[in-house]
Amino acid sequence: MSGIDPKRFGKVAVLFGGESAEREVSLTSGRLVLQGLRDAGIDAHPFDPAERPLSALKDEGFVRAFNALHGGYGENGQIQGALDFYGIRYTGSGVLGSALGLDKFRTKLVWQQTGVPTPPFETVMRGDDYAARATDIVAKLGLPLFVKPASEGSSVAVLKVKTADALPAALSEAATHDKIVIVEKSIEGGGEYTACIAGDLDLPLIKIVPAGEFYDYHAKYVANDTQYLIPCGLPAEQETELKRIARRAFDVLGCTDWGRADFMLDAAGNAYFLEVNTAPGMTDHSLPPKAARSIGIGYSELVVKVLSLTLND
């Protein structure tokens, strides 16, 4: 294990549940995190912000929080700002990194300005003329395309569009989840990868091979036929360089401590970054535990490592 005296952490709240579209995933993550911390002797307790006011954290003597909330206020900077206000240390990124990390539109703007490669894209606003915008977008980006709400995680409401006729309906559907919709050129030929980040751990890249069209919500949390390849099959030098770019993609957004950066490779091996995740899933289907396990780090040791990052200044 980490060698850290569990008493150093004090009373720890595991935040999970919440009110976002990812509540069920968060409940699963949180229960496992809670057990992992308790297995290490840490004084950890469950806390669902959908059921209790955050002020109770201070009132009940919590000094630290493991954030296992996904999406919504748990990942967009709001919970982070509240924890800052109450003087409670917490896992993951602060207000800025969390807010930017959940906002795919502004993430891509920052990446464009800082040289992090990301797929070409267009934005559509809720209420636009979807048919007219679809015609323009197909002319600019071609097909196939990915349509995504700007601020949902876990691939909620992400659609792959293969024909121009299907695009207006996909825009309309995505716009029910967010007022800004991202339409992104599909990067084909090299596969999907993720880089897991946890402090100074050198975690391997994971290649993701879903049984379906792409790595959607079902493939992430329900299906058992998604393949996770560790090692990922890339040459060591290329993997090292991709991990360096992934860390930069994370850092330029103001993200800190731990998370994930997802990217695609084209047929020539060029990387295009899709998004970061500042509060990754920690279910038995989730990627950080898989990456850690591949280098001999068990679940409990991983969550203690993540929590230990809150001990740093």
UniProtKB/Swiss-Prot annotation:
Protein's organism: Burkholderia ambifaria (strain MC40-6)
Protein name per Swiss-Prot or TrEMBL: D-alanine--D-alanine ligase
One record GO biological process: peptidoglycan biosynthetic process
Residues bound to Mg(2+) 2: E275, N277
Known role: Cell wall formation.
GO cellular component, one term: cytosol
Gene it is expressed from: ddl
Catalytic activity, as annotated: 2 D-alanine + ATP = D-alanyl-D-alanine + ADP + phosphate + H(+)
GO molecular function annotation: ATP binding; D-alanine-D-alanine ligase activity; metal ion binding
Keyword entries, A-Z: ATP-binding, Cell shape, Cell wall biogenesis/degradation, Cytoplasm, Ligase, Magnesium, Manganese, Metal-binding, Nucleotide-binding, Peptidoglycan synthesis
Subcellular localization: Cytoplasm
Cofactor or coenzyme needed: Mg(2+); Mn(2+)
Positions of the ATP-grasp domain: 108-308
Gene3D superfamilies: 3.40.50.20, ATP-grasp fold, A domain (3.30.1490.20), ATP-grasp fold, B domain (3.30.470.20)
Family of the protein in this entry: Belongs to the D-alanine--D-alanine ligase family.
Annotated pathway: Cell wall biogenesis; peptidoglycan biosynthesis
Binding residues annotated for Mg(2+) 1, in chain numbering: D262, E275
The record's free-text note on cofactor binding: Binds 2 magnesium or manganese ions per subunit.
InterPro entries per record: ATP-grasp, ATP_grasp_subdomain_1, D-Ala_lig_Van_CS, D_ala_D_ala, Dala_Dala_lig_C, Dala_Dala_lig_N, PreATP-grasp_dom_sf
Domain of life: Bacteria
Binding, ATP: 138-193
One Pfam family this sequence matches: Dala_Dala_lig_N
Enzyme Commission no: 6.3.2.4
